[in-house]
Curated annotation (Swiss-Prot):
SUPFAM superfamilies: YhbC-like, N-terminal domain (SSF75420). It holds the Pfam family RimP_N. The keyword Cytoplasm applies. The gene is rimP. The lineage of its organism: Bacteria, Pseudomonadati, Spirochaetota, Spirochaetia, Leptospirales. This is Ribosome maturation factor RimP.
Length: 162
């Protein structure tokens, strides 16, 4: 017995409560077993972190509903937070995480190789993203500003400085 990704997504729509939303869903179906991985996001937390209690509540609701609609389903369920160094969903996360350090991989007209850097998102105007180079612990230093076109940003993650 299997359950589809769409069925799980529908159950999650009912199980989730704002400010918690679905970040990603992976369903790996095997002939006799399913691995269901749910990753959550908290829209009100500065880094999107979800509490253990929130993960537990969603896990419990999803498990109960899966057992109700498909009692013979053999599955492993993993519910977690997207994490402090989560992958950015572009372009919407550019606005959401303004002011927070991010690690970006981007194309630069000056080089054939992809570039990488740690920046703070200052602002976005259409496809232009205004950044300043992140300098750990240097509050009064002159901030080096740069501008990237959104299409040149290949990937990004939140960056946690310890």
């Amino acid at each position: 017995m299997t359950v589809s990704r769409e069925e799980i997504s529908t159950i999650l729509d009912d199980a989730l409560f704002l400010p918690v939303k679905l970040y990603s869903l992976k369903v790996n179906q095997r002939p006799n077993h399913s691995l269901i991985e749910v990753v959550l996001d908290n829209l009100e937390h500065p880094y999107g972190s979800v509490s253990l209690l929130e993960c537990e509540q969603v896990s419990r609701k999803l498990k109960e509903e899966l057992e109700r609609i498909s009692p013979d389903l053999d599955f492993t369920l993993k519910v977690s937070s997207a994490g402090a160094e989560r992958k950015l969903h572009l372009p919407e996360d550019i606005d959401r995480f303004r002011g927070i350090p991010v690690r970006l991989v981007f194309r630069s007209g000056e080089s054939e190789k992809n570039q990488e850097g740690i920046f703070r998102i200052v602002n976005r105007d259409g496809d232009q993203v205004f950044l300043e180079k992140f300098q750990k612990g240097k509050k009064s230093a002159v901030k080096k500003q740069t501008t990237l076109n959104l299409k040149d940003i290949l990937k990004g993650n939140l960056y946690v400085s310890i």
